[in-house]
């Protein structure tokens, strides 16, 4: 398997990217093409011992930043590390692309350069989120602000295939994010989506309120990108603020500081459970090729796990299975 990695994407590129790649090639039977500024990437690679034939560099001179218009940047910066990584997938020279760069640019590039699977209306961003009772998926988490019911139906199908093949969970539970659990609750989108999902051969558990969403009791939370992104960012903000408040309270007195010493192992375990790097990245589902968005602040561990995630998708033929299931739906409708 060949994986194209955007060597210039992310807050800590290229050193965190290279660190993750080095660890990944030790553990996986893969080859890596790093796209980016050759001199910077080579300087990082020199710090490590590795099998030279497993990693090569495709020199690029441009970088797409998060402040740029995604579509305009894709058009203007043809020699950017992100565009070149996606082009390698399109041309069949790589089996997957990974980037921690601009989410908007990667989403647009995955759609415009790699392309959508025939029958898929919209590509969806599907991050795995740590929950109280296990990790869960939000789909869509920001790629599509305005949706139609059949988009959400397709999101559910793609999430189901991902869970069954990557996470090895059979018949994952699917919930529709809504303001109430009753079938008649919500707007026109959620009401009509509910009707579609309950008629499918899914483990559909009905509507799920946001306050229950983060428990992890439901494997896949389906919603439009506006709702999904709002849940995701609220969850991140609350988690960070809660940790900050606990630290503040611990430092207020000698007694609480002493208690903090004894509770340190507990806090470490909680931090580990909330660690996004364990899950690698967020898959863009619906593309003709494997595209994974790593977190912007990804460290080496996160990049290594994002690569591992891409390998599992490839080995389990996730793209082919999405194609097959979409064809089945359309054939049934005909």
From Swiss-Prot:
Function comment? Catalyzes the reversible formation of acyl-phosphate (acyl-PO(4)) from acyl-[acyl-carrier-protein] (acyl-ACP). This enzyme utilizes acyl-ACP as fatty acyl donor, but not acyl-CoA.
Q: Which Pfam families match?
A: FA_synthesis
In terms of superkingdom, the source organism counts as: Bacteria
Q: Which GO terms describe its cellular component?
A: cytoplasm
What is the recorded name of this protein?
A: Phosphate acyltransferase
Note the SS bond partners.
none
Reactions it catalyzes: a fatty acyl-[ACP] + phosphate = an acyl phosphate + holo-[ACP]
Lipid metabolism in keyword set = yes
Q: Which EC class is this protein assigned?
A: transferase
Q: In which pathway does it act?
A: Lipid metabolism; phospholipid metabolism
Q: Tell where it localizes.
A: Cytoplasm
Q: Which gene encodes it?
A: plsX
Q: How does it assemble?
A: Homodimer. Probably interacts with PlsY.
What the record says about family reads:
Belongs to the PlsX family.
Question: EC number(s)?
Answer: 2.3.1.274
Name the species this protein comes from. Answer: Clostridium kluyveri (strain ATCC 8527 / DSM 555 / NBRC 12016 / NCIMB 10680 / K1)
SUPFAM superfamilies reported for this sequence: Isocitrate/Isopropylmalate dehydrogenase-like
* Keywords linked to the UniProt accession: Cytoplasm, Lipid biosynthesis, Lipid metabolism, Phospholipid biosynthesis, Phospholipid metabolism, Transferase
Stored HAMAP family: PlsX (MF_00019)
| Main location as per UniProt | cytoplasm
């Amino acid at each position: 398997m060949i994986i194209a990695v955007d060597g210039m994407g992310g807050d800590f590129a290229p050193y965190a990217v290279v660190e993750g790649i080095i660890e990944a090639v030790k553990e996986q039977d893969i080859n890596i093409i790093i796209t980016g500024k050759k001199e910077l990437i080579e300087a990082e690679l020199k710090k490590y011992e590795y099998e030279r034939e497993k990693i090569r560099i495709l020199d690029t001179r441009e970088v797409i930043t998060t402040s740029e218009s995604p579509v305009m940047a894709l058009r203007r910066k043809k020699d950017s590390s992100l565009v070149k990584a996606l082009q390698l997938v399109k041309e069949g020279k790589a089996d997957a692309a990974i980037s921690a760069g601009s989410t908007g640019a990667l989403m647009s590039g995955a759609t415009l350069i790699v392309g959508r699977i025939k029958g898929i209306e919209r590509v969806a961003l599907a991050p795995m989120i740590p929950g109280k009772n296990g990790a869960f998926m939000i789909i869509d988490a920001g790629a599509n602000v305005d949706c139609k019911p059949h988009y959400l139906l397709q999101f559910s199908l793609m999430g189901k295939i991902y869970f069954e093949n990557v996470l090895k969970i059979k018949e994952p539970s699917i919930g529709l994010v809504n303001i109430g659990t009753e079938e008649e609750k919500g707007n026109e989108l959620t009401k009509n989506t509910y009707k579609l999902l309950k008629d499918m051969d899914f483990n559909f558990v009905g509507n799920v309120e946001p306050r229950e969403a983060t428990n992890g009791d439901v494997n896949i939370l389906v919603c439009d990108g506006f709702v999904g992104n709002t849940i995701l960012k609220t969850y991140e903000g609350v988690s960070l603020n809660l940790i900050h408040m606990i630290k503040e309270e611990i430092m207020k007195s000698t007694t609480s500081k002493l208690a903090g010493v004894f509770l340190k192992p507990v806090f470490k375990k909680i931090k580990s459970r909330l660690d996004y790097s364990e899950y690698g990245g967020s898959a863009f589902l619906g593309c003709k090729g494997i595209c994974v968005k790593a977190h912007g602040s990804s460290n080496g561990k996160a990049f290594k796990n994002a690569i591992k995630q891409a390998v599992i998708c490839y080995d389990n033929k996730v793209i082919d299975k999405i194609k097959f299931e979409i064809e089945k739906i359309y054939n049934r409708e005909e």
